[in-house]
């Protein structure tokens, strides 16, 4: 037994260096936070559904419109449009005041987490003339920063939705067509919003709490003009560093670009890549030495938004995560990065996860055509549910009370391998989401309560710390098998270092 313990200890020590992150010498902001510090990873949660409504996070807000999904709002835009300004203001004032409170921040700290990512839409600060949105979120954002500071939590402020929608998802505030770049007014208001955020939240007075501002969440590069998108990133960086002289971290969401795409962008070592996107004013004044610094890349990774992903076996899903981690590890020398959204989901069965009226891929009811529906008021949209190729049922995989033992094990394994991989391959992780009303695969709090999320976070049941899976006989305590598996795992670990 003692020999086994010594072997395990040696294995853990070896693993500490498996994915050592190289330091990008352009970085200079260790005082605020060091994203290259292997001893202090980001371990965070998002506070989704608070300032940007998502039907699957808080379905009760949308269920008040009845059972006919043709008439249920699909996003915050149609929610406020359908209720009207006065009623929407009344309901959302209550929601903002109660959905997250000071006690949540204390609980988040008590769970051992160190960061919260706070999504917020442009409409919290400015409105287009015909916007139905209501305002009042900003005072609660300010309270959130106070609560975070009181509980020694760091904060990412994330501009989750921009005018016209950057991706067409309901989490951008407006589901349907991607029209962000179609109107110059949309772009101008996006810059105006960011400059307000940079000025108020990006200064040194908040660097003890805010350790990054994310300029736009999940712009869908394939549905955008990529050159214009890159212009927006570079111009926003100029505003951040030069106009506002911010020393904070500039966060870029990967825009669904392939891993490695951002290596040479916003990087002092690749001026030939950056130069076409630098504005004339900067070029005339002269680009400061080490102009690009303290830039962090935010990756989002899920395994449930395609039929191919859902059809994968448990082992294939686990291998996907390992491969993903290896790819992400290779980009660290260019920009530190972390996985800023991931979940425990191995199905897409949570009610309205894919959007109101769209069904689920898992059971064959998904109808992608419904994603372009933008007007829920007149009821003109057809509600089509496709039942072709129905192989599985969501009946026993939606609510934890119905989960089989095997399904629970599969979720726990999926979460464990992600924790292991994201801890070891980059600067950490931010789980989506801290809580929901009933979508447990996306609910950190419920997952921990039901022992589906390791707590403490390194309390692994199914994997050694190098990602080698523990076989059942070893886990059950058979000394000979345990020794054999442990030695095998050690050899695997050593081979990766040679």
UniProtKB/Swiss-Prot annotation:
Covalent S-S links between cysteines: 349-394
Signal peptide: 1-18
EC class name: hydrolase
UniProt GO MF annotations: glucan exo-1,3-beta-glucosidase activity
One cellular component (GO) term of this entry: cell surface
One of the GO biological process terms: glucan catabolic process
EC number(s) stated in the UniProt entry for this protein: 3.2.1.58
Cell wall biogenesis/degradation among keywords: yes
Compartment(s) of residence: Secreted
Catalytic activity as recorded in UniProt: Successive hydrolysis of beta-D-glucose units from the non-reducing ends of (1->3)-beta-D-glucans, releasing alpha-glucose
Purpose of the protein: Beta-glucanases participate in the metabolism of beta-glucan, the main structural component of the cell wall. It could also function biosynthetically as a transglycosylase.
Protein name: Glucan 1,3-beta-glucosidase 1
